[in-house]
Amino acid sequence: MLKNPSVKYRAFAPVPLSDRQWPSKTITKPPIWMSTDLRDGNQALFEPMNAERKLRMFEMLVKIGFKEIEAGFPSASDTDFGFIRKLVEEGRVPDDVHIEVLTQARPELIARTMESLKGAKNAIVHVYNATAPNFREVVFQQGKQGVKAIATESARQIKEIAATQPETNWTFQYSPEVFSGTELDFAKEVVDAVTEIWEAGPERKVVINLPATVEMATPNIYADQIEWMHRNLERRDGIILSVHPHNDRGTAVAAAELAIMAGADRVEGCLFGNGERTGNVDLVTLALNLYSQGIDPGLDFAQINEIARTAEYCTQLPIHPRHPYVGDLVFTAFSGSHQDAIKKGLAAYKAGDIWQVPYLPLDPKDLGRTYESIIRVNSQSGKGGVSYLLEAEYDLRLPRRLQVEFSSAVQRVTDDTGKEVRAADIWRIFEEEYLTRAEPIEYLSHSLYDESGKQGVKIRIRRFGKEEELSGSGNGPIDAAMDALKLGVELRHYEEHSIGSGTDAKAVAFMEVADPEHPGDLFGVGIDANIITASFKAMLSAANRAAARRPKSEWARLCGGAE
């Protein structure tokens, strides 16, 4: 690093806005939310989503409550074009959802983009071109008027093509890319020219999106830029003012919140902050920040674990255990004083009261999470944690969420006995909790076979004391076994690893499932010399543990068969 960074880097100039109003404003309602997980988020992945993952992400976004979803960049990719056609032609876009597509400001790309939306009921066509000096001068070698002409010619072309597709309810959107690095008077000049062509008005609103394509300054600077545009743009009553913050400086959430205070009506971003470089603004954090202040965000995150696991599956990116609201450790206290304060706060809280539990900004139950994982041991009074001892003594590496779950079982034992637990005690607790449960279902044996290109399985079990042989098929052994057993749980996550090495090696399988009738996911564990057998044992372990939370009268409904 340089001793004097000022010789290489320049401080961002403040905005001349001496009478700024945003510092005295408060947020009282949610913005319009636009998810760009399928476009900006997808293009930033090591391996972009395939059609199956894209569709799963789209359906989840709809379920959460997004009414505007940017589904792709159809002129840049045949895959994106085909996916958008699939959504339109198969009627997968609900009537109250606007599908959005992005295009560069080039005639042939605009034409291809508009073609992708033929037959759509509600569509947003989003065109952009870079307006910042370094892009004008270095990348495009254009003057201001040349850049402005690109924007206006594109706006005119979009308007003309839209008139030939009257079956679609169109919304036009323009972004001066790298707005945060563009001179404000020039950004206004370009935007005003575009909104004039589109005849923006109260009955014909357009979206003007002001992106921090690269986050260049502190959030207050971005707020000043947004307020300046909010106060100076022509045809403001015909504009939905949108922001698209990136997280290069780590303050995208704050920038978005201050931008809303400064006059923004709409926010574009991704679940859990996915996106180019350091990511887009995290819409989950933004929404739950509002929720924790008593404002309904209009998005449903009541099953945050399911949403997180689906996002991880679709993006193939892990969510950090410290991620706000959703990370595996955010509702977990390791400090003894924190544990004591939380216990007392939970004991004092009564349903209907204002939430004031120390260290917990909102009630985990509101997100479908449970209190059991909040208080946990972490280091056996400084002599090594539960998970450390299991790994050190038994070569068992528990997934993070299972560490949280199992530590509660250990805590119950230490609370009951008041004694220190050693590695052998922890292993005994683990066996009893996960490995030796045989009610109501016990694994006996299985065989695999091919069935019309799918995996078939015959699995022998003892259920409610009676031996049975069941058959099923699926995309793999686990899917086939789930088909055969007809268990009333949903698979959330699966992982495995080996224990030991050489001829004595075994496999351990961890299966995380959800019981639709009980909040909070739970794990099953199986250990065997054969990995498939270990997987089946883990499946039944999870089902038996789910059954243990229910009265016996409900076991048949959960585990199939008849008592």
UniProtKB/Swiss-Prot annotation:
Coiled-coil ranges from the UniProt annotation: none
Top-rank lineage group of the source organism: Bacteria
GO biological-process terms attached to the record: L-leucine biosynthetic process
Alphabetized GO MF terms: 2-isopropylmalate synthase activity; acetyl-CoA C-acetyltransferase activity; magnesium ion binding
A Pfam short name: HMGL-like
Catalytic activity: 3-methyl-2-oxobutanoate + acetyl-CoA + H2O = (2S)-2-isopropylmalate + CoA + H(+)
Residue numbers spanned by region Regulatory domain: 437-563
InterPro entries linked to this entry: 2-isopropylmalate_synth_dimer, AIPM/Hcit_synth_CS, Aldolase_TIM, IPM_Synthase, LeuA-like_post-cat, LeuA_allosteric_dom_sf, LeuA_N_DRE-TIM, PYR_CT
Cofactor annotation: Mg(2+)
Pyruvate carboxyltransferase domain ranges (all copies): 31-305
Keywords assigned: Amino-acid biosynthesis, Branched-chain amino acid biosynthesis, Cytoplasm, Leucine biosynthesis, Magnesium, Metal-binding, Transferase
Assigned EC number: 2.3.3.13
Residues the entry annotates as binding Mg(2+): D40, H244, H246, N280
GO CC terms in record: cytoplasm
Recorded family membership: Belongs to the alpha-IPM synthase/homocitrate synthase family. LeuA type 2 subfamily.
Oligomer and partners: Homodimer.
Protein name from the UniProt record: 2-isopropylmalate synthase
Source organism of this protein record: Parvibaculum lavamentivorans (strain DS-1 / DSM 13023 / NCIMB 13966)
Gene name linked to the record: leuA
